[in-house]
Amino acid sequence: MAQSGPMLAYRHAFHAGNHADVLKHLVLVSVLRHMAQKEKGFRVVDTHAGAGGYSLESRYARQKAEYAAGIERLYDAADLPPALADYVAQVRAFNGDGALKQYPGSPAIARMLLRPQ
C-alpha cells in the first residue's frame, strides 16, 4: 500500500502528562507495586517507553498543553482513590519542589518503584 503524503515524526513531548499518560502510568505504578510485594525478583521491559522525563514548561508541552486535561487536573486534587493518589505521589516526588514542572516518563516511574532483588 502506497503512503499518501510525508511520514510525520512522533514527538511525545507534545503529549506528556495527557489523559493517556495518566492511564498508562497509573496502571504501571499499580503493577509495579503489586510485583514488588513478591519476594521473587522481576524485570521491567517497556517496549513503548519514551524519555525518562519531560519538561511541562517546554515549547513542545506548552504548544498543545495536553497535560492540562491530564496530570494538571489531578496534581492538587484532594480525596483521590488510593491507586490514583499513589500515582500522583510519584509525579510529585519527581518534581521535588512541589510545583508541577516536570512529568516522569515510564523509565523514571519504573526506576522510582524498583526495589533491590
Set out the residue ranges of the language-model regions.
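Glycine-rich His-Gly loop
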Residues: 17, 47-49
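Class I SAM-dependent methyltransferase Rossmann-like catalytic core
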Residues: 2-39, 59-64, 68
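Gly/serine-rich nucleotide phosphate-binding loop at the start of the catalytic core
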Residues: 38-46
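Class I S-adenosyl-L-methionine-dependent methyltransferase module
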Residues: 42-43, 51-117
